[in-house]
Every structure is written in structure tokens, then in C-alpha cells.
Amino acid sequence: MHDTELVKVILGLQADIAALKRMVAGNLRFGTVKKVDHDTKRVQLLLSDANGREFLSPLRPWGEIAGTEKSWRPPTQGQQMMLVAPHGDMRQAVALPMTYSDQNASPSSDPGTRILSTFGGATMLFDGGGDRAE
């Protein structure tokens, strides 16, 4: 192999590595809900890049239970979510609910209790021992 051919191969490999790094870096991103479009069931997240610069995601669907059983739990502004984008491709991305935050704290720390808390203050509470259901 001649030097010029070797240089071309190395440059091609460098380009491939750079593309793979971008794909891996874009697979999972964490952000907060900026906008919810209830009609199209899509959400826009405020994300940041590796340098800390903020940017808005495109409107992407959020994950829900959607088989025979269905759920409707639209995200709310400020909620933390994870954007899963196969191969870093935002066109395929889906937003999934994430962790608690200062704005959206956990409703309990009791390991024996299950709570579903909704907007408007309504709460369903189940005690693991079967003693309570509210």
C-alpha cells in the first residue's frame, strides 16, 4: 500500500470514528419538558450539548402504555425526561419519563407504599400490607 492510500484509509477511519462518537453521544439525552402538544402527543425538550449549550429538541412522541391496555399521562412543563434516539437520530427519538426534581418531588419515601399522584391534588395510595387503599 502506498503512503497516499494509507493516508486516505486513516482519514476515512477518523471520519468513521467521529461519526460513531456523534451517534453514541446522541443516543441518550436528558432534559426538561419545554412544550407539550397534546393533539399530536409530542413533546419538546430543553437539552444541552457536551459543551453545556442549551438547545430545543424537535417535537417527539413520549412513551406510553399503548397495547390492549392504554394510558394517558401527558408530560408537564419542567418535568425531567430522557430522550432515546437510536444511533443519535432525532427523527427516531422517543421521550421517556425520568427522575424526580426540585420542581417535581417524590410524593413519598416509604418503600411499602405505592402512590399515584395527579394534578389537582388527587392521590391514590396503596399500602403494601393491604391495610390501606385511599
Residue positions per predicted region:
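Short, intrinsically disordered, charge-balanced linker/junction segments flanking boundaries
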Residues: 131-134
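Exposed beta-strand/loop interface patches that mediate assembly or binding
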Residues: 1-129
